[in-house]
Amino acid sequence: MTNYFPWLTIIVLLPIFAGSLIFFLPHRGNKVIRWYTICICSLELLLTTYTFCYHFQLNDPLTQLTEDYKWINFFDFYWRLGIDGLSIGPILLTGFITTLATLAARPVTRDSRLFHFLMLAMYSGQIGSFSSRDLLLFFIMWELELIPVYLLLAMWGGKKRLYSATKFILYTAGGSIFLLIGVLGIGLYGSNEPTLNLETLSNQSYPVALEIILYIGFLIAFSVKLPIIPLHTWLPDTHGEAHYSTCMLLAGILLKMGAYGLVRINMELLPHAHSIFSPWLIIVGAIQIIYAALTSPGQRNLKKRIAYSSVSHMGFIIIGIGSITDTGLNGAILQIISHGFIGAALFFLAGTSYDRIRLVYLDEMGGMAIHLPKIFTIFSILSMASLALPGMSGFLAELIVFFGIITSHQYLLMPKILITFVMAIGMILTPIYLLSMLRQMFYGYKLFNVPNSYFLDFGPRELFVSISILLPIIAIGIYPDFVLSLSVDKVEAIISNYFYQ
């Protein structure tokens, strides 16, 4: 279905163009800029929702709302956009989290024009990379995303912000080199005219050796973003230093771009190599769940502890992608959406409680529950969501990944039992570090000894942000078909490539 009205182009370009108008707004304090940004974000979210409700057919696994504009003539480079069941979930998640992150960024007063412009530019890059149907365009959007994050880190971070920003840019730019090599290698192979169109590429077959080389290149690029150990070390530093609204975007969306690329490029375009590499992916995912869950209790810094819990949750996504079953891949997509909400909410709460008590190390905190009862309540609920309490979205996602790995015909019985056992140990270790974090922060008497200790509890703004993240978590936990019905046809189409041989 070719659409004559360029919905997706408007959705991708609106935030960055509207954001560049911020610099022309009158100097009337930060309030104008803040409200302008929030309005742009909400308008974008409404526009996206409208487009998906009225112009998107759920039961069609093909790409919809496609747009094709010639961009560079002699290189056959098109501005190609289109969405299918795989990208619609992350795009809506992006809109939701970015709107709430701009709402959460109210304490930022220094250089607030640049800050809000960077938030909007990041928004464009994220939606562009989720909806692009051209590999080079995907790469450009992937890179466009990188610069705002670096600046947000280096200008509004904590004490060691320059170190962590440099580490971040080195890791991700190093990964992007491999991504560029892979994109050019795929585009230039096997035909006189280079093509970068995802549709034509997904029907093309490559020699297995070349496919493996390309696969490794893409895998390195994506495992920096979706941190797969041993390439995860930028994540705790970056999260420990960034301002919490940046953290929400990092945990909620940036990590999901890696998972999306893994499914979109490695699984769709390179099926043979993926079936060779998937046992290794599963092993790495299981190791990662255990490793991050064991490293997390040793972190004194609150944000670093939450960052390691993110790394641990990403292990489930890797296992779901590696299991090559409908169930496993659906579980991975559900975990992508669910962790997008949970991770963002936890970082938001960590940041707001830091705004209240100005302590970042867990062993200095204690007794916060008496002064800040609302923060305590919401933090506890979200920790339960993160440790996969039944009725929350995390539980269902991990359960579906479990079923996916058990029902997989790819592997023998013994390895499957072993991997399931390791995953179960990881799920047991998760409550240990999360509950000890709650205990160190909220229980005890430490903050009693602070002179004139009167702390403001949650205001209406913080309550609004945290509850609007909490509602989708519970909704997905009770009725996961919200998310699964979007992607289930597309997932079947991807998996059917694997069993035609």
UniProtKB/Swiss-Prot annotation:
GO cellular component, one term: chloroplast thylakoid membrane
Domain of life: Eukaryota
GO MF annotation, one: ubiquinone binding
InterPro entries: NADH_Q_OxRdtase_chain4, NADH_Q_OxRdtase_chainM/4, NADH_UbQ_OxRdtase, ND/Mrp_TM
Subcellular location: Plastid, Chloroplast thylakoid membrane
Coiled-coil segments: none
EC number: 7.1.1.-
Sequence intervals crossing the membrane: 5-25, 38-58, 85-105, 112-130, 135-155, 168-188, 209-229, 243-263, 275-295, 306-326, 331-351, 387-407, 417-437, 463-483
Keywords: Chloroplast, Membrane, NAD, NADP, Plastid, Plastoquinone, Quinone, Thylakoid, Translocase, Transmembrane, Transmembrane helix
Bilayer topology term: Multi-pass membrane protein
Entry-linked HAMAP family: NDH1_NuoM
PANTHER family linked: NAD(P)H-QUINONE OXIDOREDUCTASE CHAIN 4, CHLOROPLASTIC, NADH-UBIQUINONE OXIDOREDUCTASE CHAIN 4
Designated name of the protein: NAD(P)H-quinone oxidoreductase chain 4, chloroplastic
Organism: Eucalyptus globulus subsp. globulus
Source organism phylogeny: Eukaryota, Viridiplantae, Streptophyta, Embryophyta, Tracheophyta
